[in-house]
Swiss-Prot record:
This is Probable malate:quinone oxidoreductase. Residues 539-548 have a biased composition (Basic and acidic residues). Its cofactor is FAD. Residues 521-548 are annotated as: Disordered. GO terms for molecular function: 2-hydroxyglutarate dehydrogenase activity; L-malate dehydrogenase (quinone) activity. The lineage of its organism: Bacteria, Pseudomonadati, Pseudomonadota, Gammaproteobacteria, Enterobacterales. It comes from Escherichia coli (strain ATCC 8739 / DSM 1576 / NBRC 3972 / NCIMB 8545 / WDCM 00012 / Crooks). InterPro entries: FAD/NAD-bd_sf, MQO. Keywords: FAD, Flavoprotein, Oxidoreductase, Tricarboxylic acid cycle. SUPFAM superfamilies: FAD/NAD(P)-binding domain (SSF51905).
Amino acid sequence: MKKVTAMLFSMAVGLNAVSMAAKAKASEEQETDVLLIGGGIMSATLGTYLRELEPEWSMTMVERLEGVAQESSNGWNNAGTGHSALMELNYTPQNADGSISIEKAVAINEAFQISRQFWAHQVERGVLRTPRSFINTVPHMSFVWGEDNVNFLRARYAALQQSSLFRGMRYSEDHAQIKEWAPLVMEGRDPQQKVAATRTEIGTDVNYGEITRQLIASLQKKSNFSLQLSSEVRALKRNDDNTWTVTVADLKNGTAQNIRAKFVFIGAGGAALKLLQESGIPEAKDYAGFPVGGQFLVSENPDVVNHHLAKVYGKASVGAPPMSVPHIDTRVLDGKRVVLFGPFATFSTKFLKNGSLWDLMSSTTTSNVMPMMHVGLDNFDLVKYLVSQVMLSEEDRFEALKEYYPQAKKEDWRLWQAGQRVQIIKRDAEKGGVLRLGTEVVSDQQGTIAALLGASPGASTAAPIMLDLLEKVFGDRVSSPQWQATLKAIVPSYGRKLNGDVAATERELQYTSEVLGLKYDKPQAADSTPKPQLKPKPVQKEVADIAL
């Protein structure tokens, strides 16, 4: 019966798309150089790059909702972290010999420096205005308890001192010092509990929705840019000349139109996978998606909000996925400070917060169903974790909060449903299918269509991700002197690494901090904390590395 239902649904969707395409033929076809599907931060960032690189190119952006930045980019639908691995412990895994690997942390930090430079450049151009409206200095802290976790954090701190990107980080195991950094976390805590924390002053809280709105508002000032809201893509068809005909439905009046584009970018968040599949390119067959939602506890009580100015990340329990890392964060949303705690995982078959319950079923195909099954079998701990999260009661969530805020009061907090994230499942020759952390740019061989899949670190690395896309689909142009000069004007460190170059790191941090109105003091010598001799890590089954 389930198979029949799925088949009938697929037929209905297919017939509807054919009907839409037929109706669209009767209307005049719109032509554009670049079609941006989705009104989120990825499309906005790519459009902003292309506006500087090729100002004469025409661009059309289509968004199914009534406004831009209303899904994952919306400030209330994500954690608002400027992910730079200053506090996220899952980016520094412990190796089997007990040492700490910092390669992933360095890569994440390098990527965020590109985002800072991109935003600073847009402020200087007048594209982004009033930096305080979208980015603010909020110290980033890691906080752990228990002897093993304290040893891990001490070793992590020592390992990160090898990189110029993490200079200025401080470490402490002293209750009084940590209380000064994060009073809300320490007040009411057992004074005998073994704790440790790191703190980096240059952490940030970012409103990605505000960045998106400002970037798109600037694009709209040009006559060769068109924004179409309440417009949903129903079909994509490759033409003989390698252009694309995209059928777009107007959700308000029920009409449809065809847009003929030389290049199509699918930056539709959770909906990107289904649209990529609709395109029919062979590269899409390697991917499936699994949706995971998130909830946060929110407090707007001034007694709580004014007592906490930091993003404080903990450590996932043994065997739990990194998505379970709790954090209690200062946020600045719509000009107002609030405190969020979470996330708590939720499950829905929707790929978007405003999506359809049929999303998961309609994206499941004969080519990706086996990789999905392999991932489910290989990640039973993850399945158990998700089930346990869905079963959490109000009291369970409050008890989790009290581990980070011992004196919390229930009446100060409310539960908020944040956005959906579609985790990448990719076909793997060895394992059948693997769950992937991060984002991936998937494109056809001709470089005429590209999609962004994945969830983390997401918006905080929009600028470097879109740079990767430019290099992948516009390789010849990227290597030209004109594009090289423009890209280096947008991102001064483009083409080189900051890690290992103290002077270059300090120069870029000083520049972006001044333009974006962020705090930055030149780092002093690192604390002389001894590096512990960690015990070799017991051999454990690899945990799926995914994140909300």
